[in-house]
Every structure is written in structure tokens, then in C-alpha cells.
Amino acid sequence: MSQSTSVFRRNGFTFKQFFVAHDRCAMKVGTDGILLGAWAPVAGVKRCLDIGAGSGLLALMLAQRTDDSVMIDAVELESEAAAQAQENINQSPWAERINVHTADILQWITQQTVRFDLIISNPPYYQQGVECATPQREQARYTTTLDHPSLLTCAAECITEEGFFCVVLPEQIGNGFTELALSMGWHLRLRTDVAENEARLPHRVLLAFSPQAGECFSDRLVIRGPDQNYSEAYTALTQAFYLFM
């Protein structure tokens, strides 16, 4: 089924159970975040952490996918984005389950005593390069404020022994991220390579790491079929969220 353009509003994106305004956020709602929020394993989780929450998209998706006992912390450094995430969450059915923190994750994590069963992040991945239009967008896109070793260290400090740390990255950067994670003691447990269609090479990769060793499951997801409509696999993954699926 093709995605209807009517799910877009001028300042945000309407899902089946919630609306995400993102006009005050550097990075907008996009396929990467939707993929990650729908894909991350949630079975048995009790507490979740969203690092770099932006508009609150991932926290809201996790809230929709989990039962009412699951608590979610969403940490966002940029104050305007954090304020908008809070507004989005306040207007959702899960305001009492999601706590937004305007903070630097590197400092916030040192003050935490709880551990998380699921940590999720759609992290920055560009090295400093082409100048961005705003400092906020630069912060969201570049690894200058949160590099990958620091991100992996943060997650390691607050994850449960059997928990999962999930990210979405461009394919090649994801391969480098995996090598780094393995060198730091993480174990790759789930990997899904994402291609736009059958004729294209994968352009994104979904990765789930755990402190605990175990079998690694990998697969491939194609977003669109030969007719350019969403594939059956992509529809099955995301239909709980997209308004017209």
C-alpha cells in the first residue's frame, strides 16, 4: 500500500495512535526512526531508554508496543527538541509512562541507579564536514557531541545483563559501529539489512547488541515491492503505526 501524503501536516506526522510535531526539532520524522521503533525487540522489557530522543518518536513507538507497566526515559540534549518531545508525549495516551530529560546523556547516565532492558538510539553518524544550516541540526547529524565510543560506553553502563541496545545506521557506518562494539565487549544478536527494493543494495542496517553472548540472527528487509508500494514485510513491521496501512 502506498503511503498517503495526508499523514503529513505542515509541522509533523500523524500516526494511528499519536501525532508527532517536529517543526522545532533538527531531525524530522523519517523512515530510519520508524524502522527502528517498530523493529526493536520489546518482549519482556520493563524499562526503556531512548538516547537522543529528538521529537519523542521512538519513545512513543515503544510506549505503543509495550504494556502499561513499562516505563520509558527519553534523554535529549537540545532544549527546544526536548520541549517539543514533552508536548508530543503529553498529548499521547502514554504521558504517565514516558519521562523526558533535557540533559547530556554522558552526565545524565552517571546519576542513574536503575538499569534498562532496552536502550534505543537513532544516533548521529556524520563526521564534521559540510556546514549545517543551524547548530541544532549539526548536533543531530554529527558525532561531535556524542561519538560512537561514548554512546556504546553509556549504554554499557546502564543496560541489564540480558538487555538489548538497538541502533539504526547507514550500512557502511553500521559495519564500523559493529566492529567497534565487538571490540568493547558487546555481542551482536540481531541484524536486519534494509534495502529500498530488491534491485538495490542495502542502505540502512538495524542492529541489536547485548552484553550477553548468544546466537546472532540476521535477515534482509525490502521496503518497496516491484509495484513501488510497500512490501508485505515492511507493511507487517510498520502497519501498527502508519495511518493508511
From Swiss-Prot:
It is found in: Cytoplasm. Signal peptide: none annotated. GO terms for biological process: methylation; tRNA processing. One of its GO terms (molecular function) is tRNA (adenine-N6)-methyltransferase activity. It holds the Pfam family MTS. InterPro entries: DNA_methylase_N6_adenine_CS, SAM-dependent_MTases_sf, Small_mtfrase_dom, tRNA_Adenine-N(6)_MTase, tRNA_adenine-N6_MeTrfase. Keywords: Cytoplasm, Methyltransferase, S-adenosyl-L-methionine, Transferase, tRNA processing. Belongs to the methyltransferase superfamily. tRNA (adenine-N(6)-)-methyltransferase family. It catalyses: adenosine(37) in tRNA1(Val) + S-adenosyl-L-methionine = N(6)-methyladenosine(37) in tRNA1(Val) + S-adenosyl-L-homocysteine + H(+). One of its GO terms (cellular component) is cytoplasm. This is tRNA1(Val) (adenine(37)-N6)-methyltransferase. SUPFAM superfamilies: S-adenosyl-L-methionine-dependent methyltransferases. Its EC number is 2.1.1.223. The keyword S-adenosyl-L-methionine applies. It is an enzyme of class 2 (transferase). Specifically methylates the adenine in position 37 of tRNA(1)(Val) (anticodon cmo5UAC). The gene is yfiC.
